[in-house]
Regions:
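Intrinsic, low-complexity polybasic segments
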Residues: 3-8
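Transition segments tied to proteolytic processing and entry into folded domains
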Residues: 18-20, 30-195
Length: 195
């Protein structure tokens, strides 16, 4: 026997349980991703990098190699060479994956670039002399400018404030890595580590 309003209470309870389950799954996915990476300090990234560059993404192109694998070339206009070998006014970063026609090849821990984005990248040069982002998504910092002050802040999955919609924010809070990080402080730490 059911009473008036009982069905709506049951549906409300199911919605809450479904939402809780979805939240737990998203947090678990974020924790799984973080667990698959050992966080690297800024100093470690700087010490291992062949170059550290502050720049703007001006172009991206996706191609296939002879083996049929998809790869992406990311072209940066260099604003400042913070450390390492100078390579002129541009830097081309190569990484596996991308979108080519209807084919998508991606890794959740691969850095994501977009045209127009201001970034700081820690790169190593492979045997073909191509720049590759060091430590996957740990070697790329997004630069954001505060609207009122213009102060440049940086972040990656393990350093700086998390994006509001980033499921890894839970992990960053758990690891105590939710402090703001300015571009100036990042540069200072890179230069100090390079000495």
């Amino acid at each position: 026997m059911s009473f008036p309003g009982q069905a709506s209470n049951l549906r409300g309870g199911m919605k809450r349980r479904s939402f809780a389950l979805l939240t737990a799954l998203l947090a678990g996915a974020a924790l799984g991703q973080a667990a698959s990476q050992v966080p690297l300090s800024i100093e470690t990234l700087a010490a291992k990098a062949d170059a550290v560059v502050h720049g703007t993404v001006v172009r991206m192109s996706c191609q296939r190699d002879d083996g049929g694998r998809i790869f992406t070339k990311v072209h940066l206009q260099i604003i400042e060479q913070m450390n390492g070998r100078q390579r002129g006014g541009t830097l081309v970063i190569v990484q596996g994956g991308g979108v080519l026609g209807r084919r998508i090849a991606r890794s959740p821990i691969q850095p994501t670039y977009r045209v127009g984005a201001e970034v700081v990248v820690f790169v190593v040069f492979n045997s073909r002399g191509e720049a590759v982002t060091l430590g996957l998504n740990q070697g790329k910092f997004d630069v954001m400018r505060q609207p009122k002050t213009g102060l440049a802040m940086v972040r990656n999955p393990f350093h700086g404030l998390a994006k509001r919609d980033d499921p890894r924010a839970v992990v960053k809070r758990a690891l105590g890595q939710t402090k703001p990080l300015t571009l100036a402080e990042l540069k200072r730490r890179v230069r100090r580590a390079a000495k």
